[in-house]
């Protein structure tokens, strides 16, 4: 089936209750469950089968996994036992500590947890071997349905499991997230903030502990109170350091959850503490304020109880905040709203969302370092009209997320290095060209270009109009992206790449024979020689005429014009509908062709006989066609070669078809200039003649 275009642009920020059905059957969780109950069967998910394809894509299991339902592993399975808590999360044989750290943080926010794990499921009445979970993806909530067959070895769960062997919510949640991303293997390696955002639809913020503000403790305290999800880790300098244990019992390159922050009285002083959890369920900090450290002997039983202090090897531990800053390198916070943690006020934020793509050859221009292509990136107009309350500037947050890179890992895709720049917008209401960026500096930009799924930063700018340009660092790199803009006051955003405007002059009337130029007289003689008495040429004859003339032109390198091009030319110029070209029609086309040749030569900078697809937007606009990025992408796919170049024959074909389509549309849109109405016969007739 052909690709169906869906318009990009601003979208509403969805709420979880609108979670979209994702199962290939098109049925909801409840519909499939009722169907299984009526049939007396347990659900088997054909979309994510109990087979190796759901486990790995680049390797085979080293041990013979057996897929079993919880009721085949234990006698009395429970979905959630005594509430979903962080102690229900123990890492298995999969390198997805980042996901487990995010799940542990999720359990601290019951409202967010209930959104991800719907409460309408259990192993009790109504059990049919089917469960579902809801995740946020690129500004929409998805309902992911799975069966409850889990990979086991010797009757033990291989991957994520609960400390209580008859509790299965965490293992099933991991399976649903693996399905969302294509396989269990796709979950290897990552950042906790990624899953935190998928659990909440929140906004990411990262702090370097060594460069954190003076009120860093208060920032983390406020984040936990607001229900934000927090993770932390220690940087590694090489692959060899990954999961290396420090002398203090901490693991480098390993994702931890921040589960609490508090103060304790110790020898007349208030000591700031922070509680951390290792998703392994063991291996803990062994320094000051660790589970068995002597400091706790100076703390009364009531205070110890309040802080839930126990000397258990459960992976959770307290440490002094100053030690935390000294040993950990980064803290990732997923805020459920964009309110700055440095401020006390809570605001109502306006959100707009843009879905877009970087496509090689048309919109994958790279960063400003690559001036020749940077201007071809998607451009979004941002209108800031209202100042913040009591301020002279407008606050907003920009979050740029590249889509589905984890899902595409099986095809060799990596997380790209991304960022964005913001420019003051000139009065022109159009896609800005190369010269604008040659002479204008950005007004603001992301702090860095980095290979993370999302890059987000806060800004304050005076009211006005700006152009926001999201890009990869290197040009020619392809990805889809989701751009979210949060503003305290309503900001108007518009995609500058979606406009289509055709400006074609009326075709000139042919000159009478006695007023023909010397060039036209030579054409008439050649035409008579080829066409005969009727003075009409077929596509084959037109091919001969054009190539005979163009080969004498020394200023353009080109291969012969193809027969297809000549058929398209006749389709454009043939007013009688007999499939041939009369001499007067040819004269009109020749004038047009000379203009197009000059246009091609203008953009064939190196005189190689080809032009870059990145120049296509400007070249087509000069010919009268202002096209959307989506149309440009289709043209590049159809006409460009592997080196993203077009020769003259391809360029001519493109222009002929564009003009033909435009003139047909103009002829049919008599009442409404933006729409035409066709029945199936008219539509097919139209497409066969363009």
UniProtKB/Swiss-Prot annotation:
Residues 1-24, 498-519 are annotated as: Disordered. Residues 42-337 form the Calpain catalytic domain. Ca(2+) 2 binds at residues 284, 291, 312, 314, 316. Ca(2+) 3 binds at residues 574, 576, 578, 580, 585. Ca(2+) 4 binds at residues 604, 606, 608, 610, 615. InterPro entries: C2_III (IPR033883), Calpain_cysteine_protease (IPR022684), Calpain_domain_III (IPR022682), Calpain_III (IPR022683), Calpain_III_sf (IPR036213), EF-hand-dom_pair (IPR011992), EF_Hand_1_Ca_BS (IPR018247), EF_hand_dom (IPR002048). Keywords: Calcium, Hydrolase, Metal-binding, Protease, Repeat, Thiol protease. Residues 522-690 are annotated as: Domain IV. One of its GO terms (cellular component) is cytoplasm. Ca(2+) 1 binds at residues 81, 83, 88, 167. GO terms for biological process: digestion; proteolysis. Belongs to the peptidase C2 family. It comes from Homo sapiens (Human). This is Calpain-9. One of its GO terms (molecular function) is calcium ion binding. Induction: Down-regulated in gastric cancer tissue and in gastric cell lines of differentiated and poorly differentiated types. The active site is at residues 97, 254, 278. Residues 518-552, 561-589, 591-626 form the EF-hand domain. The lineage of its organism: Eukaryota, Metazoa, Chordata, Craniata, Vertebrata. It holds the Pfam family Peptidase_C2. PROSITE patterns: CALPAIN_CAT, EF_HAND_1, EF_HAND_2, THIOL_PROTEASE_CYS.
